[in-house]
Amino acid sequence: MISLKGGETETVGRREGTGEEGVWNHIKPSRLGIYVGITYLFLIALAEILTVEDARIGITAHIFILFATLIHSTLTSDRNLSAFIMSLVLAPLIRILSISMPLTHFSRISWFMLISIPIFIATFTCIYLQGIKLGDVGFSKPILRNIPLECGVIPLAVPLGFAEYLILKPEPLPHHSFISASLILIICTGLVEELTFRGLLQYNATRVMSKWSGILLISAIFAVLHIGNLSILDCIFAFFIGFLFSIVRERTRTIYGISISHGLINIILFLVAPLMQ
């Protein structure tokens, strides 16, 4: 990803009739993006901690963050920063949907599929409203020299999937067709989550801050959304996976390989490893 280009922050907070600049105008655009990102990271993490204590309080906190991002994005004069804040709405939306749709009413595989549909729609709505090309969010033509890296990340899913199983130890899923369940996991967790985080969010983040700051921030947001698994080790693991996938996405400019790898990790975690115990 690239550092901020051609998106100099417009004057924010200028008082009409006086020419006096607001305090925000003295902050470099890249630093302002970092401050905004860290603020929302903190709020999302706080909402996740509250969810662990009481799901009703947690979902209320996520709803607050959702509306805060929507309102904040409309009040921000810098176009790139506004787009970044708008895309952050996807993080609380994911948790609102997952918390409000309990597993007791659906099998886990069906749950993954149902959750992914509104997330997929919301992500593409952001892409459309922001006028982003599909190639900018990872749907670009693979470059020949990047294919080894694109394909090389896929087999890493096997040890990573077993490693996450050792952390979480999920129960075996009820009987499902292995093929259909695998396809759902690849598309509904792999593709949708990679499009959301390494596609849209990473693209917007690296336009308002440096490449590495954007990668670290999105990896951290991805990690804190795993707080509900009640494992600090899993949050660290999720950060590592997110960081790894972000680097591959940055080098290859696509999300094909990491989407398959992400899906395979979940196939190992939920379908393969539990049956081997």
How would you describe each model-predicted region?
Residues 1-130, 274-277:
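N-terminal, membrane-interfacial amphipathic/helix-forming hydrophobic leader that caps
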Residues 192, 203-204:
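Membrane-interfacial catalytic/cofactor-binding modules of polytopic membrane enzymes
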Residues 134, 198, 202, 242-246:
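Interfacial helix-capping/hinge residues at the ends of transmembrane alpha-helices
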Residues 54-57, 104-115, 181, 206-218, ...:
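Membrane-interface starts of transmembrane alpha-helices
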Residues 99-189:
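Juxtamembrane helix-loop-helix connectors linking adjacent transmembrane helices
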Residues 191, 208, 212-277:
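Functionally important transmembrane alpha-helices
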Residues 190-198:
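Acidic (Asp/Glu-rich) catalytic motifs at the cytosolic membrane interface
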Residues 40-49, 89-101, 156-165, 219-227, ...:
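Aromatic-anchored segments of alpha-helical transmembrane domains
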